[in-house]
């Protein structure tokens, strides 16, 4: 198990993701020698469907790393309870811009975190990727999962503002402080991942090419990108009504 955790660290995964992998694998460590025991532990668990699917994904990654083909195949075929549709909190561009406008009486810390929050929304990058930005010939690159470098598009004015604080960013080891400021500036229901989800929702609903959004976010496949599209129930109903109740010309 330790060699797998070392592998996840080399892949440049976030600290929170690595901790999740560790926690899940420790939960299954006593039964990892038997597929039947693993299956029974999954099936008989009292976790919510979303947590069970998370466990499945972690175990799939672990089995793939260990080249346990039979375990991998059996787990892929294992039927799990369906995940209920869940509406996550996202923030609109206009609302985010209002909340991150820098005011004259803002402290230096508030100015810094308002800039970071706006940059995360405008780029859709993962919070920990902030520490791996590289500017080359007016192009911006980030080191993402699996140590894969990708080019990202950005708003020049926001990035120039961010550069004023960038040396301070280098000292962060976790995004815990960032989480606290996001809740303070935007609202208690928001997290760094909410900004990433908000970016995807905004871009896709405005008609952006899904592949462009996929590449910007560093996703390996388009299905993952579409899973970030999050419209609340009211928005879904408004879109449905607009389409269904419009008068089509014959």
Curated annotation (Swiss-Prot):
Q: Please identify the protein, giving its name as recorded.
A: Tyrosine recombinase UU222
GO process terms (BP)? cell division; chromosome segregation; DNA integration; DNA recombination
Chief location of this protein?
cytoplasm
Q: Which domain of life is it from?
A: Bacteria
Q: Which residues form the Core-binding (CB) domain?
A: 1-67
**MF term (GO), any:** DNA binding
Keyword field? Cell cycle, Cell division, Chromosome partition, Cytoplasm, DNA integration, DNA recombination, DNA-binding
